[in-house]
């Protein structure tokens, strides 16, 4: 009796683990799309409204989902305070602190941090080119992952059972 109950618990837990892993994969794609949206919003603020970077971040924060809104607000606040820290370091620190509970992989966060290195110190034209490049990279990654979804979802759910 106890063995049957234990076996049922193990099967249930492994099934739920597979479903959870599948959901996390889908959530990662959604969050990469949100990063894409963030870059487009910042690009619009900088190129068309001629906003300073902290202002562009703050303005974009109101238009994005949690936890990216707080990431942008915190980054803008710290950039405004300008305590002698380079913007790229500040950006990377906020990624580590504000985006640690997301479905984004370490690689996704590192690429986003590299994008942050191109903000703030380059002229507007170079920032525009850096944003275009990062958007293209994101687009390619999202396309690849969307093609992988059916296979990965099936794999995770099968492994769970």
Regions found by a protein language model. Give the residues of each.
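Membrane-interface, cytosolic juxtamembrane amphipathic helix immediately N-terminal to a transmembrane helix
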Residues: 118-161
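Acidic, low-complexity proline/glycine-rich segments
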Residues: 1-10, 99, 105
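Conserved phosphate/pyrophosphate-binding and hydrolysis machinery centered on Walker-type P-loop NTPases
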Residues: 28, 81, 124, 128
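Juxtamembrane/interface alpha-helical elements of multi-pass membrane proteins
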Residues: 6-78
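A generic short alpha-helical patch detector that favors 3-5-residue windows
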Residues: 30, 103-107, 130
């Amino acid at each position: 009796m106890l063995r049957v109950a234990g076996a049922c618990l193990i099967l249930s837990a492994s099934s739920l683990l597979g479903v959870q892993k599948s959901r996390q994969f889908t959530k990662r794609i959604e969050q990469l799309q949100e990063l894409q949206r963030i870059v487009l919003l910042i690009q619009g603020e900088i190129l068309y409204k001629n906003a300073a970077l902290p202002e562009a971040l703050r303005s974009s924060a109101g238009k994005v989902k949690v936890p990216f809104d707080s990431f942008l607000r915190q980054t803008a606040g710290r950039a405004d305070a300008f305590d002698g820290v380079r913007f790229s370091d500040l950006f990377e620190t906020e990624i580590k602190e504000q985006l640690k509970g997301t479905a984004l992989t370490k690689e996704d966060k590192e690429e986003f941090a590299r994008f942050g290195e191109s903000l703030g110190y380059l002229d507007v034209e170079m920032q525009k080119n850096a944003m275009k490049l990062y958007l293209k990279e994101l687009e390619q990654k999202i396309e690849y992952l969307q093609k992988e979804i059916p296979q990965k979802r099936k794999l995770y759910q099968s492994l769970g059972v």
